[in-house]
Amino acid sequence: MAEQKSSYGYEELLACGRGEMFGPGNAQLPLPPMLMIHRITEISETGGAFDKGYIRAEYDVRPDDWYFPCHFQGNPIMPGCLGLDGMWQLTGFFLGWLGEPGRGMALSTGEVKFKGMVRPHTKLLEYGIDFKRVMRGRLVLGTADGWLKADGELIYQATDLRVGLSKEGSAQ
């Protein structure tokens, strides 16, 4: 497993996407264009809203990002599900960073609120994930609340984001 650091750059996140960070069969980020994170600015096993750990990350929005031309033609908006997926990506990364074994999968979320949009003129997305608990059993399960800011304005909130790590590779 890679050294446990408190921040990660883009090349390190790509290495995680190739399965090189946490070892074969363990937590892995998606590769571009589905990778919704450009850097992890802070990660800690303690602190956060529930004092169970947190992660902060950023994504640089570009006017030519792949989703703008198709969602929607003449009215470009980043699909909200991509921001939500970024929250799940970070939740899974945290579990791998803790050294937990298994392949990651998004399982569910509680409530999701969309209060704004990501447009081509948006410059920076900031993610915040605050962990409520990590349960270790047959499946390692991380539960967290998350938020997303666009150029400093809170636009998405999600409660009870759940990501599991399974040694078998599925949640079943």
Curated annotation (Swiss-Prot):
Where it sits in the cell: the answer is: Cytoplasm
Catalytic reactions on record: a (3R)-hydroxyacyl-[ACP] = a (2E)-enoyl-[ACP] + H2O; (3R)-hydroxydecanoyl-[ACP] = (2E)-decenoyl-[ACP] + H2O; (2E)-decenoyl-[ACP] = (3Z)-decenoyl-[ACP]
| EC number(s) given by UniProt | 4.2.1.59, 5.3.3.14
Mind listing the GO molecular function terms for this protein?
A: (3R)-hydroxyacyl-[acyl-carrier-protein] dehydratase activity; trans-2-decenoyl-acyl-carrier-protein isomerase activity
**Could you list the residue ranges forming a coiled coil in this record?**
none
GO cellular component, as recorded: cytoplasm
Which chain regions cross the lipid bilayer? none
Source species, domain of life: Bacteria
Per its UniProt record, what CDD domains does this chain match? FabA
Write out the entry's keywords from A to Z.
Answer: Cytoplasm, Fatty acid biosynthesis, Fatty acid metabolism, Isomerase, Lipid biosynthesis, Lipid metabolism, Lyase
Q: Signal as a keyword?
A: no
Its pathway, per UniProt, is: Lipid metabolism; fatty acid biosynthesis
User: Where, by residue number, is the active site?
Assistant: 71
The record's principal subcellular location, in a coarse class, is cytoplasm
Q: Which biological process, per GO, is one annotated for this protein?
A: unsaturated fatty acid biosynthetic process
Q: What does this protein do?
A: Necessary for the introduction of cis unsaturation into fatty acids. Catalyzes the dehydration of (3R)-3-hydroxydecanoyl-ACP to E-(2)-decenoyl-ACP and then its isomerization to Z-(3)-decenoyl-ACP. Can catalyze the dehydratase reaction for beta-hydroxyacyl-ACPs with saturated chain lengths up to 16:0, being most active on intermediate chain length.
The similarity annotation says: Belongs to the thioester dehydratase family. FabA subfamily.
Provide the assembly information.
Homodimer.
What NCBIfam families does this protein's entry cite?
fabA, PRK05174.1
Protein name as annotated: 3-hydroxydecanoyl-[acyl-carrier-protein] dehydratase
Instruction: Write down the species.
Output: Brucella canis (strain ATCC 23365 / NCTC 10854 / RM-666)
